[in-house]
């Protein structure tokens, strides 16, 4: 018989650095999930990834206090900042001050990596979404 799902929890955790301190510990603890078990499993699953990369994770927890988790690709903003080699977007996007520039090829690379997490039918649709995010961060898309 299948386990009864008690709920789902969405978190964003840095790769390789899950620990029981806030915000992870309290979020898991109040739902009765074994915090250290999650931290060990998550860190083991992300050990090959770049340390500190933000990873969205969806934790499904069951009434018997067990859990499973699914990891997604890092947010588009992370990829945009990494490709543009900047630490943050423009403070006033669209007002003249550009935070950096990206090429269509860089946008396509990001779109291919994020395709399974995006709500897009094809790569062109995914690229359009990512270009919109880039403009919202004050990045200029050229080429």
Curated annotation (Swiss-Prot):
InterPro entries: Ribosomal_uL11, Ribosomal_uL11_bac-typ, Ribosomal_uL11_C, Ribosomal_uL11_C_sf, Ribosomal_uL11_N, Ribosomal_uL11_N_sf. Keywords: Methylation, Ribonucleoprotein, Ribosomal protein, RNA-binding, rRNA-binding. One of its GO terms (cellular component) is cytosolic large ribosomal subunit. Part of the ribosomal stalk of the 50S ribosomal subunit. Interacts with L10 and the large rRNA to form the base of the stalk. L10 forms an elongated spine to which L12 dimers bind in a sequential fashion forming a multimeric L10(L12)X complex. Forms part of the ribosomal stalk which helps the ribosome interact with GTP-bound translation factors. PANTHER family: 60S RIBOSOMAL PROTEIN L12 (PTHR11661), LARGE RIBOSOMAL SUBUNIT PROTEIN UL11M (PTHR11661:SF1). This is Large ribosomal subunit protein uL11.
